[in-house]
């Protein structure tokens, strides 16, 4: 696998030199300063590429080109936004970048309730607490009909949770959920946030699916012409939240999407942490069935808690993800590609990492501190080397 690292640009506290020292050779990056929907010009793309290559690294994957909300809802100026997206893809391809990760999650890119969850060893991780999230929906946001999404027991626990929160805790939980995270442009007040949710009140899973398929069918001629691979990121968490539909959460979703849009440039990002939150997602089988569609992979693990909808980010080789067999199957897919003449390695990045050691004293992007990802990359690299020597170099 190609060892890559997500970098948030010149303002990222983790420098390109740090990334080189971690052993990564590829950079995963996006032009986050350009508003959603606007065209990424060649001048801006080449300027960023020059910075990356100036540190003897390669811009391997774009993560991500955000999809405008009006494309997802297929309302307003969606046709204009699609044309802009096409031009951005053309510009990226003509600048030598051939893989783009994106997502089709309504409103929020990814959601956690705690960005500083303390682990037993004193490091910090990201966490999603189902009861805290219920307290937010039911008693802070007060989303209409939110009670329909929670059991009576969860509603009771959420009320107790909320009643014991201070004003500061309410503000922090709210900020964690709706204030926006690294790589995302949007941040909302409660009122603005509810207004965004309301845009989807008449959009169910089938409608959102069809909007995604429509969008991809518009892009495929360009992708096929330029050899540019799209790799959709799964929903995080992989189930409906906030009354919003989700369309990339299970193998059934992948089956549907690849049937509706069969072109090979329509691919997936295998994010083991996102898919792995669901106990009914067999990650190894997903790779076996759709390995030829995997153009990018995020390797991390999560640990489901007593409430199976709650989880926290585990160590890369721990938690619920069978990382041994996941990496084994990815290496088998690379071997299949090599035999067919495709020598391009699958770009892999150690997704997220615990905040630990000296990084505990620093301001870092949630999930994207240097040392935790350095540890994760080293562990996955060691696993890959061991598997290759034992099974693939004979």
UniProtKB/Swiss-Prot annotation:
Which Gene Ontology terms cover its molecular function?
ferrous iron binding; manganese ion binding; mannonate dehydratase activity
Q: Which reaction(s) does its UniProt entry say it catalyses?
A: D-mannonate = 2-dehydro-3-deoxy-D-gluconate + H2O
- E.C. designation(s): 4.2.1.8
Q: Which Gene3D superfamilies match?
A: Divalent-metal-dependent TIM barrel enzymes (3.20.20.150)
Q: Which organism is it from?
A: Psychromonas ingrahamii (strain DSM 17664 / CCUG 51855 / 37)
- Pathway(s) of this molecule: Carbohydrate metabolism; pentose and glucuronate interconversion
Enumerate the cofactors the protein uses: Fe(2+); Mn(2+)
Q: Which family does it belong to?
A: Belongs to the mannonate dehydratase family.
What this protein is reported to do is described as: Catalyzes the dehydration of D-mannonate.
HAMAP family hit by this protein: UxuA
**GO annotation terms (biological process):** D-glucuronate catabolic process
Name of this protein: Mannonate dehydratase
Name the keywords, alphabetized: Iron, Lyase, Manganese
